[in-house]
Amino acid sequence: MLKISLLSIIILIVSGCSTIQVTSEYNPKRDFSSLKTYAWLNDMDHPSDNLRINNELVIRSVRNAVEESLESKGFVKTTRDQADFLISWFGAIEQKVKAETITHFYAPYGYGTLYRDPAWNTQAQAVALKEYEKGSLIFDLLDPKSNTLIWRGIGQDRITEGLSGEKIKKNLHLAVSQILADFPPEIK
């Protein structure tokens, strides 16, 4: 019982320390210091064909997280015709397979290592295939006049199954804030 509890705690700690892989790219010729206002590209989002992403609760959580993050940086939400930049987003869930090599050390015939020839190799390897899901959030920021991309932020992480709605919302907020941490970029 103690082993199971300890294992559960270790798994919880490791999964809690999971970091989102964030990348961003932008137009280095763009003057980001002039950006003050923003608006959503579409009032009605259809961010994915996956029903786990394309539902009202997830869409609202992502939008709220984006707006909170941008407002904390001093950006003001406005109408499309007055915005300095527009925001669009997309989400995806991919099925992935990870191959792990497992090395087994065992003693022959149940006698333990003291009763065998030390020259006899008791090491064996096996490959375990583990399926998992990888989630991606992509934010595109566009110039409203030319409709060209000025900044893109991408966040990816392994999806943890069986989370409560509140935990999913918290993870989405964390992902959005980490992705938008690189916006506006510091151009050198």
PLM ranges: what are they?
Residues 35, 81-86, 132-137:
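Extracytoplasmic
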Residues 1-6:
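Bacterial N-terminal signal peptides that target proteins for export
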Residues 90-148:
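Surface-exposed short loop/turn segments
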Residues 39, 86-89, 149-152:
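Structural recognition of the beta-strand scaffold that forms the well-ordered cores
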Residues 26-46:
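Post-signal peptide N-terminal segment of mature Sec-exported envelope proteins
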Residues 18-30, 125-188:
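C-terminal/domain-edge helix-coil "capping" segments
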Residues 13-16:
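C-terminal motif of bacterial Sec signal peptides marking the signal peptidase cleavage site
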Residues 42-98:
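N-terminal segment of the mature soluble domain
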